[in-house]
């Protein structure tokens, strides 16, 4: 799950950096809060793997809110909260600033070194087909649909009020 989330976030948050004016929808990403539905699939050695996931995302700068696989993940750019309501579990982690796969902001700031690892196709005015090459054998494909650009609203939607959770929740804080 961590690889799905961080791969998706790295891809999404870096889209504006890769636009270079060639795909108009990408030029708008840095100046807006972006909301969309995604489908994620993984392939290895050119063959699709059975794992296909979908969910909804809201992104603003280096903060995001993602729901999928029965989980809700929020990050304000420094802390990540991963909640499974059904299991009544919450995992709190620090966003690692040194690791590309756990810090999408690093991906943005270092995008020039990774331009050969992302392929973007604009399917329509409000959808994208993005492939992120993870290594020589493995790639992740994200199809982003129903992309909506909203005004920026700040990071309060990307944090979690842990004290509001029921006492039955198991909270693991790894910060």
PLM features per residue range, with description:
Residues 54-56, 70-72, 119, 139-141:
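Short, surface-exposed charged micro-motifs
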Residues 39-45, 67, 83-85, 133-135:
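A generic structural motif
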Residues 56-102:
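An acidic-aromatic
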Residues 15-50, 62, 163-175:
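N-terminal leader/targeting segments and the immediate start of mature chains
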Residues 124-175:
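Non-transmembrane domains of secretory- and envelope-associated proteins
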Residues 1-4:
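Positively charged n-region of N-terminal signal peptides that target proteins for export
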Residues 7-16:
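Bacterial N-terminal signal peptides
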Residues 61-63, 105-139:
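Extended beta-strand-rich segments in extracellular/periplasmic secretory proteins, especially
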């Amino acid at each position: 799950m961590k690889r799905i989330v961080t791969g998706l976030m790295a891809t999404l948050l870096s889209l504006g950096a890769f636009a270079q004016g060639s795909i108009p929808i990408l030029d708008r990403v840095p100046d807006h809060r972006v909301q969309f539905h995604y489908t994620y699939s993984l392939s290895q050695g050119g063959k699709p793997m059975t794992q296909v996931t979908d969910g909804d995302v809201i992104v603003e700068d280096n903060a995001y809110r993602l729901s999928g696989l029965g989980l809700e993940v929020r990050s304000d750019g420094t802390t990540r909260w991963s909640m499974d309501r059904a299991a009544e579990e919450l995992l709190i982690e620090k966003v690692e600033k040194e690791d590309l796969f756990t810090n999408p902001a690093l991906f943005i700031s270092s995008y020039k070194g990774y331009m050969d690892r992302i392929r973007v196709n604009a399917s329509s005015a409000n959808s994208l087909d993005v492939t992120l090459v993870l290594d020589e054998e493995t790639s992740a494909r994200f199809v982003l649909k129903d992309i909506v650009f909203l005004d920026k609203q700040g990071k309060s939607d990307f944090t979690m009020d842990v004290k509001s959770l029921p006492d039955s929740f198991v909270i693991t804080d790894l910060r």
